Amino acid sequence: MKVGVALSGGVDSAVALYLLLKEGHEVKAFHMKTKEDEFFIRKEIKKKVCCSPSDTADAMRIAHFLGVEIEIVDVKEIFREKVIEPFKSDLLKGLTPNPCVHCNRFVKFGYLMDYVLNQGFDAFASGHYARIEFSEKYGRKVIKKGVDLKKDQSYFLARIEPWRIERLIFPNGIYTKEEIRKIAEEAGIHVAKKQESQDVCFIPDGSIENFLKDEGITLKEGDLITPEGEVVGRHFGYPLYTIGQRKGFKIEKFGRRYYVRGKIPEKNVVVVSDLEDVFFSGLIAEDPVWHVEVPEEFKCVCRVRKKSEEAPAVVKLRDNEVEVRFEKKVFAVTPGQIAAFYDGDTLLGGAIIKEGIR
């Protein structure tokens, strides 16, 4: 089989490439450039991020070592259009966006995958910790969680187009991270011990404030208020805060611990309240993407953030939205984040959280 592999320059994609070669596939590597190299040279890199010049060098070295052709693919234009601009826009709307989910949908498993398939490849592969399996229950291939639940990345795949699943391969999904590193070490791949990417690739210094400043937007301080309208402190720019956050603002009225309950962008206000006020009985999410056919009402488990606990829930479809009701209240349901839905370890799909239901 002819397989195009997304090679980031990290250990996961390197081992995915290696495993496919061992299985006898005809393989070519593709490396994305999401930003110009000068961007990473100018920025202070506080956390390991993907797509830097060193990652490109590593990807080329891996491909050379394994004896495969590599092509550098310029995705800067679509990355800005589909990831950076919506991220900026959502922040200013008071949302907490998840750029990695949008990158997967529109760039890696969108533009890049199309680019690969249009070259005549049979399948597209990456180093994600997830599995592609045929489901007897749903009568089609589905995405399942990776066996290493600590590293499972299925959540980030919740909004890719369902037809693409038929053409995807995730070789790493049946291994743990430790096993992947061991395979790399035994194969002599030089990135076997390379640090994982930990932050948003286009914010290598980890500062939302600096990102917005670079985009020509200066944050303004504003009032921190209770739901009753009492001013209890100051915030340093509403895009810096997310639901459930309890640090990073200036409290002027002490005696209570405050958590971010919501934001009012048009008034430059952040609303804070008690802990119990940031637990939610449900949510409304919009623009759902379903990988399988689902009924108008069904039970499943829902994850509202990458690291959130899975919550048993009832989902009701309505127009281009879904209403989700949890069995037990869930902490910090956050507009802009992704609600991913599972049947056991099978990913059913995902939608963008519009609002929490208290």
Curated annotation (Swiss-Prot):
One Gene Ontology cellular component annotation held by this UniProt entry: cytoplasm
Residue numbers marked as site, Interaction with tRNA: H128, Q337
Record localization: Cytoplasm
One GO MF term: ATP binding
EC number(s) per entry: 2.8.1.13
Keyword Amino-acid biosynthesis: no
Covalent S-S links between cysteines: C103-C201
UniProt-listed CDD domains: MnmA_TRMU-like
Signal peptide: none
Positions of the UniProt region annotated as Interaction with tRNA: 151-153
Record InterPro entries: MnmA-like, MnmA-like_C, MnmA-like_central, MnmA-like_central_sf, Rossmann-like_a/b/a_fold
GO biological process annotation, one example: tRNA wobble position uridine thiolation
Annotated active site: C103 (nucleophile), C201 (cysteine persulfide intermediate)
Chain residues that bind ATP: A6, L7, S8, G9, G10, V11, D12, S13, M32, G127
Top-level division of the source organism's lineage: Bacteria
Entry keyword set: ATP-binding, Cytoplasm, Disulfide bond, Nucleotide-binding, RNA-binding, Transferase, tRNA processing, tRNA-binding
Task performed by this protein: Catalyzes the 2-thiolation of uridine at the wobble position (U34) of tRNA, leading to the formation of s(2)U34.
HAMAP family per UniProt: tRNA_thiouridyl_MnmA
Protein family: Belongs to the MnmA/TRMU family.
Protein name: tRNA-specific 2-thiouridylase MnmA
Lineage: Bacteria, Thermotogati, Thermotogota, Thermotogae, Thermotogales
